Each structure stands twice: as C-alpha cells, then as structure tokens.
Amino acid sequence: MKISETKNRIIETASFLFYKNGYNATGINEIIAEAGIAKATLYNHFKSKEALCLAYLQFKNTTFIKGIEVYTRSKPKGKDQILAIFDFLGIFFQNKDFNGCWCIKTVSEIPKDNEVIRSEIQLQKNNFIDLISKLIMDNLDHFSEKEVTSLARQIYLLYESAVGESHLHQADWPIKETKNLCSQIIN
C-alpha cells in the first residue's frame, strides 16, 4: 500500500473516531486497531496525537469547504446562494453521523494554552467567514465593504448557532429558523 493511502486511511479513521467519540475519548490504540496498522506506522506519519488532530481538523474542513462551495454555486445567483449554506447544513444534519461542529467539539476538549490546535480552528472559522463574505459580494451589490464584513460575521454566528442547537435538540428547527432570520437580515 502506498504511503499516501496509509496516511489517508489513518486520517479518515481518526476523523471518524474523533468526531464520533471526541478527541480525548479516542485513544491512539483505538485508531491503530480501526485503521488496521502498526503503532510504528501511525508514528511514521504523525509524530503525536496533536499532529493527528491537526490532520483531522484540516481533513474535515477541506471536505466541508469543498462541499459547501459546490452546493452554493449550484443555486441561482442572489439570496439563494447565501441561504444555501443553511440548506447544506440541513443535509449535513440529516446524515446519521451528524454530531455537531468538529471544531467546537475539539476546542472544548483541549487545554486553553494549546495554541497549535486553537489557531487552526480559528483559521478555519475565519476562512468560513471569508467564504460567506465572498458569497455576499458575489450575490448582493447593495452593501459596502464594512457592511459585508459585519453581515458575514452575523451570518456566521447564525450558522454556528444552528449547528450547535440542531445537535443539542436533535432537530432541524434551529436550521430552518436561522435560515429565516438570515433571509430577513440580507434584504
């Protein structure tokens, strides 16, 4: 098996387990057993559990960003492309493996002084705000740059709330309500 295939299998296995069970609740031995590899193989690819956590966060984020970009672009130009982020979340919520936000789950489990993981999560969240800003600029022309920044942050906060509350309540009404609220604020 190629090195990249092995590394990808380790990342995919760790991603599944970290997201399902939590970062702290998932041990290295569990990842090794699930991936069907030797301990030395894991440590040839990742020097620590923290390095594997970074790969997990990056894997989840890359998959998410690609998916949401394709999905939003498939919608008609205008408000629909912006509101589509909530429809995308609704589809994600319907997945039997939905377990909330991988970033928030992870940051809640790490020590406050773990700047490596915290910085990666902040970067991902800021990149999502940038994606929302781009959606606004590409689809709505009546906002100034300053207004776009503020609006993107507001939509981001609505989205994050919808993720957390839909997970908590195990229902999609938070997604529907935040989409309705977003529709009102982008008019």
Task: Name what the model sees in each region.
Residues 55, 69-95, 151-155:
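Hydrophobic alpha-helical connector segments
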Residues 50-52, 106:
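A secondary-structure capping/hinge motif
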